């Protein structure tokens, strides 16, 4: 997840770009860069790390007078966070910035390399500028740009400047946000979000998917699906905090709604035909792995628990799960050459990092599932996969959990493929998951209405079976973190072994009742709680009249699609209860986003 800005006008361009990137820094911050076109000359600057590093690099650079500039702040998805991989990416006479993922970048890169084109970076973005210059050998600039964009598959919002046409900025947008702003001074602005435009623009146009065009001092031309579009601008809101949240009340709410797009990005470039592919694992033989240990803390531990079921069921590999803070002190025995997978959103979780070191010392092959490239955990592990969740501002994890489970599910399928096991049903379900987490307004409104029943009482049970047990644990954790109400997750089959003693009308039970995973067994457990007067909210695609409240989910073909749909419901429920209680959903008390100490 990255942020892009652009500017056409007479003011100091460097500072406008830096100011704009500052407003987008929450989208990504492992590197940043900018390019300025003035009087036909192209200047560019890049820096790794925080935005201030870029500002320091261009301290003496001045850019008054007419021209244009583009800038980018990056959160790595393809390629390490290095200066070479930072945007803008350069051709011989052009440069480009890009937010998104080019799904077919390897295919394009291979084609261009056969034509003698050389690449400097490891990124997917560089193919855009190299492909453009390849076509511009024989075509006009706009025709070359059109042909380039038509060849790209995936999500992208991109800006290009070229010395071949020093009077225009070229842009394109598909499945990633791009906004064009204007003001009375005939200046044009481009941005991934509203925040950089507030105070500089009066009106904005939100580009639709499959849009491309060009802009200069005197004109803006936009095509949508190859049809010339009439320009339609709307008034820009003046609230920057609101803009950063894209109109949502809280970052957590925004991040719940982002999960569909983010999960699409997790899949991009990693499914080819009917197979899961990981470029990062091309040279690795995981077919001989006969034991997996998954180790994590908190929400990541719940993702590990869910994936243990998947590794055993899909890949037929023995899997066990460890809490990192316990593992590091109990003198655990790790089988040499087994696979030791650590999971961490930040890549800096102290207990998980120490557990990784112990496993490595004992001879295990170590594997990191992480959201932050170049973090300590990623650098230390033998292998790694990035979850591509982007920045998560809400302290209570939502999209990071979703992408961890999805990435681990894909890894289980990948390992099953290496063992020549049939995974066709898994691939079909994988491709459907982004739809499963898309939030419908009617659902959110219903959860908001139901939430008022669940504001008091002496506690909550979240219950489920199989992968829905770790989801119950995660649902209970979300509610605890945000509402400060007591909540516990249990395997539904364990109710009779003690917890049912708490059941009465002020014990609230959230029952996860999927059609495709032990429905009748779970239903029987829920009926036992109802018989003892527990107030029950059941979540299922199958009608269940005995519960006090019922949320009907969609009929799915695979239990993991049910898993992700129910995940969203538990997230929204925890958030709505907490909002009714007057709590700060983004910054719950006593908690930090990344736990880097014991």
Curated annotation (Swiss-Prot):
Classification via Pfam families: GATase_6, SIS
GO function terms (MF aspect): carbohydrate derivative binding; glutamine-fructose-6-phosphate transaminase (isomerizing) activity
Active site location: 2, 593
Span of domain SIS: 277-421, 450-588
EC assignment: 2.6.1.16
GO terms for biological process, alphabetical: carbohydrate metabolic process; fructose 6-phosphate metabolic process; protein N-linked glycosylation; UDP-N-acetylglucosamine metabolic process
Keyword annotations of the record: Aminotransferase, Cytoplasm, Glutamine amidotransferase, Repeat, Transferase
InterPro entries attached to this UniProt entry: GATase_2_dom, GFAT, GFAT_N, GlmS/AgaS_SIS, GlmS/FrlB_SIS, Ntn_hydrolases_N, SIS_dom, SIS_dom_sf
Residue span(s) of domain Glutamine amidotransferase type-2: 2-218
Ranges annotated as spanning the membrane: none
Subcellular localization: Cytoplasm
Catalysed reaction, written as an equation: D-fructose 6-phosphate + L-glutamine = D-glucosamine 6-phosphate + L-glutamate
Gene Ontology CC annotation, any one: cytosol
SUBUNIT field: Homodimer.
Described purpose of this protein according to its UniProt entry: Catalyzes the first step in hexosamine metabolism, converting fructose-6P into glucosamine-6P using glutamine as a nitrogen source.
Protein name (Swiss-Prot/TrEMBL): Glutamine--fructose-6-phosphate aminotransferase [isomerizing]
Protein source organism: Campylobacter jejuni subsp. jejuni serotype O:2 (strain ATCC 700819 / NCTC 11168)
